[in-house]
């Protein structure tokens, strides 16, 4: 996924179909300078991760 699309999805009111390593996730924040995204698992919102934006996949 590219940074611009990740930013669009992070501010969208609708739940996006995004996955990280096969897990459905939500994007909380995108850090353009580091090209990373703060995400959490849909099924486990308490598990937050910072991952490279290019490791996210829109499904």
Swiss-Prot record:
Principal location: other
Q: Which domain of life is it from?
A: Bacteria
Quote a single Gene Ontology cellular component term: endospore-forming forespore
Where does it live in the cell? Spore core
Report any Pfam family annotated for this entry: SspH
Keywords in alphabetical order: Sporulation
Q: Does the keyword Aminoacyl-tRNA synthetase apply?
A: no
InterPro entries attached here?
SASP_SspH
- GO annotation (BP), single: sporulation resulting in formation of a cellular spore
Question: What does its record list under induction?
Answer: Expressed only in the forespore compartment of sporulating cells.
By sequence similarity, the record places it as follows:
Belongs to the SspH family.
Q: What protein name is recorded for this chain? A: Small, acid-soluble spore protein H 2
Organism of this sequence: Bacillus anthracis
Gene giving rise to this polypeptide: sspH2
């Amino acid at each position: 996924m590219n940074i611009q699309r990740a930013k669009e999805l992070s501010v969208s009111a609708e739940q996006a179909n995004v996955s990280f390593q096969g897990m459905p996730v939500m994007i909380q924040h995108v850090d353009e300078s580091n090209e990373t995204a703060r995400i959490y698992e849909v099924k486990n919102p308490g598990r937050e991760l910072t991952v490279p934006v290019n490791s996210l996949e829109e499904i």
